[in-house]
Amino acid sequence: MSKDLDIVVFGASGYTGKLVVEYLKNEYGENGSLKWAIAGRDETKLTAVKEEFSLGNDLETVIVESDDLDSLDLMTNATKCVLTTVGPYQLYGSKLVESCARNGTDYVDLTGEPGWMYEMISAHSKEAKESGSRIVFSCGFDSIPFDLGVYFLQKNMQKKYGKTSNKIRGRVKAMN
């Protein structure tokens, strides 16, 4: 099946989804070099997003339910990448990751749920590799503190020992 869309923003009517829509509109317009669409479960809310950002009827709207694998497959077969803001991901993201991995569609989210990420990697990494799907978790604020910690650690390892670490393990602990 031809993947006519470059990106589908799933969860476009939520707060973070609207930020993504605004960015894509400002950077690429609705008929620019990037072919993108908005998706969610409520057509009325998606229409309101189009009106809020003065997006015309040419911008495709995809109605999809996060627990309906058939509708997710239709979406993931039509695009190269799904950027999802629909969380919590452990409740609403598992079937989407499965669909992307199976259909060779890239997946991007901004989760901060490490246990769920581990489950998804364990369940879908082999199929994603075989299909060419790239699964990218935590692409946003939730990952920044850990990324900065790794950067600081590697910088100090290089300074003190003359080399960086090949492997760094982290853990998430309750913050009271």
Region spans (language model):
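ADP-ribose/adenylate-binding Rossmann-like module
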Residues: 88, 99-117
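Structural motif
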Residues: 6, 80-81, 106
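Conserved glycine-rich Rossmann-like NAD(P)H-binding loop of the short-chain dehydrogenase/reductase
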Residues: 29-45
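Rossmann-fold NAD(P)-binding glycine/threonine-rich loop
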Residues: 111-133
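Short, conserved SAM-binding/catalytic segment
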Residues: 49-57
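N-terminal Rossmann NAD(P)H-binding glycine-rich loop of SDR-like oxidoreductase domains
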Residues: 5-28
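Conserved Rossmann-fold cofactor-binding substructure of NAD(P)-dependent oxidoreductases
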Residues: 62-92
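Conserved anion/nucleotide-ligand pocket segment
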Residues: 136-142, 146-176
